[in-house]
Each structure stands twice: as structure tokens, then as C-alpha cells.
Amino acid sequence: MIDAKLVKELRDRTGAGMMDCKKALEEANGDMEQAIEILRKKGIAKAAKKASRETGDGIIAAYVHFNKRIGVLVELNCETDFVARTEDFQELGNKIAMHIAAMSPRWVRREDVPQEVIEKEKEIYRDQLKDSGKPEHVIEKIVEGKLNKFFEENCLYEQKFAFDEDKTVEELIKESIAKIGENIRVSRFVKYTVGE
């Protein structure tokens, strides 16, 4: 088990996301320098440094399923119109739109989930465990784990990428940031399904 202080320190040093830092530290058996190297090799540290840059350009990527019953629009932003016109960027938009069609996320990031939804989920999880006889601190750990699973299932950035489950959508985007050299982000999306 990796200490949360180590994860925070790695995040402060690289700007990478918490889950990326935790995975890198686990892979490096807690070695900070090796974890930084792992993040650099994956392009995540580089991507994190670009994350604060403004993304005022981009595209609306569209995907319509072959049966014409599911359609997705996704706003994918970057820093310049030059990048927005590249084949790599447009392909990324198409991949993300197809992923949304397949996996039906509800929000882009966990920060986008309304607090009342989070509280309701926690309440449901606590109710499921109230008669378990487990101590309160154990129940809270279980609730936290279930909540993380909820985010992984419902937040686009935390979902396993539908076409390569070895990475999340966020990791796919960070790889593109490292390759393209500009900050990239999904601003919003909408999925339409006939009859819903």
C-alpha cells in the first residue's frame, strides 16, 4: 500500500493526477525518483505541465453509430487552430466520441459530479453496510472505495478506454498532449439515443 503523503509529494513535483501518481509509485515500489521517471516515460509529467495552458481552440467531434440510433457530439479543445486541423487531433476526437457512444459516461471529470449526487451515493453505500457489523472507520474506507468505483464508471476521464482497457481516457489524452505538444481537454459532450 502506497502512503498518501508520497502520492501527494509526487503530484506536487510533477503536476500529474493522483491516480497516475499512485500507479507510478506502485510500479516503482515507492521509489520517488523511479516514479517520476515512469511518469516522464508515459508523457504524463509533460502533459501535467501543459495542463494550465489555455485551450481556446478545438473541434466538435461527431460520431453516429452504424444503426443510426446513437449519436455523440464532443467538444475537444486545444491551444491552436493548427493543432485542431491535424489528423492526430481529429482522430483523438473521433476515438473519444466512439468511446462515449460505447461506455455512456455521465460527466467529464469527477469534479463535474454534483455534490448532491456524491452524497446520495455515499448514503446508499452506508445503508448497504450498516448491518455488516464492521467498525465505522472500515465502513468509511469501503464507502470511499465504492465511490471511486462510481467515478471510474461514470466520469469520462476515469473510464477505461473502450478500445484499450490498459489505459484510461485521461491517459489517452495525456499521451496525445505529450505527442502533440499542446494542452488538450474535453470540455463537454452529449450522447443521443433514439427513444431516450
Swiss-Prot record:
Keyword Protein biosynthesis included in the entry's annotation: yes
Entry-linked InterPro entries: EF-Ts_dimer_sf, Transl_elong_EFTs/EF1B, Transl_elong_EFTs/EF1B_dimer, Transl_elong_Ts_CS, UBA-like_sf
Top-level taxon of the source organism: Bacteria
Annotated keywords: Cytoplasm, Elongation factor, Protein biosynthesis
Region spans: Involved in Mg(2+) ion dislocation from EF-Tu: 80-83
Location in or out of the cell: Cytoplasm
GO terms assigned for molecular function: translation elongation factor activity
Gene3D superfamilies the record matches: 1.10.286.20, DNA helicase RuvA subunit, C-terminal domain, Elongation factor Ts, dimerisation domain
Xref: Pfam families: EF_TS
GO cellular component, one term: cytoplasm
Function: Associates with the EF-Tu.GDP complex and induces the exchange of GDP to GTP. It remains bound to the aminoacyl-tRNA.EF-Tu.GTP complex up to the GTP hydrolysis stage on the ribosome.
Family, similarity comment: Belongs to the EF-Ts family.
UniProt-listed NCBIfam families: tsf (TIGR00116)
Protein name: Elongation factor Ts
Gene: tsf
